[in-house]
Curated annotation (Swiss-Prot):
Keyword Protein biosynthesis applies: no
GO cellular component, one term: NADH dehydrogenase complex
Primary localisation category: membrane
Keywords, ordered alphabetically: Cell inner membrane, Cell membrane, Membrane, NAD, Quinone, Translocase, Transmembrane, Transmembrane helix, Transport
Signal sequence, renumbered to the chain: none
Disulfide bonds: none
PANTHER family associated with the record: NADH-UBIQUINONE OXIDOREDUCTASE CHAIN 3
Name by which UniProt lists this protein: NADH-quinone oxidoreductase subunit A
Organism: Chlorobium phaeovibrioides (strain DSM 265 / 1930)
Record field: transmembrane: 8-28, 63-83, 93-113
Source organism, top-level taxon: Bacteria
Taxonomic classification: Bacteria, Pseudomonadati, Chlorobiota, Chlorobiia, Chlorobiales
Length: 143
């Protein structure tokens, strides 16, 4: 029990020293830097150009979908890398497990592909127009 508390105590002291070091750096910088604000310094800097429009721009949802799919497959690599390093010791059961894992992710990719989430430009659905019916004869023309 004492050994565990001692290890957590070391981690806590290390964390506390890190916080003190960062806070000390901020306080030292605040005391030493000159403070001369003016409108040019407080304006928005955008690659040397004047800022145009609002910063609250709506991004296309396709960016998020592509990023999410990338993260999913990036995490897959993170999970498969340790498996690949000890593949020979694990045997055929581990191979089957890895293939099932990769298969599930490939099914997810196929689903996203079929659904159209990977298409950058989606075709707009078109509604067929109803053909115009010829004008019916009025009752006076029938007589």
């Amino acid at each position: 029990m004492d050994q565990t508390l001692s290890e957590f105590g070391n981690v806590f002291v290390f964390f506390l020293l890190g916080v003190v070091f960062v806070a000390g750096g901020y306080l030292t910088a605040r005391m030493l830097r000159p403070s001369r604000p003016n409108p040019v310094k407080t304006s928005t800097y955008e690659c040397g150009e004047e800022a145009v429009g609002s910063a609250w721009v709506k991004f296309n949802i396709r960016f998020y979908v592509v990023a999410l799919i990338f993260i999913i497959f990036d995490v897959e690599v993170v999970f498969l890398f340790p498996w690949a390093t000890v593949f020979r010791q694990l045997g055929s059961f581990a191979l089957v497990e890895a293939l099932v894992f990769a298969g599930i992710l490939i099914l997810g990719l196929v689903y996203a592909w079929v659904k159209g989430d990977l298409d950058w430009v989606r075709p707009t659905p078109s509604v067929p127009k109803m053909p115009e019916m010829p004008a019916s004869k009025s009752s006076s023309q029938r007589d």
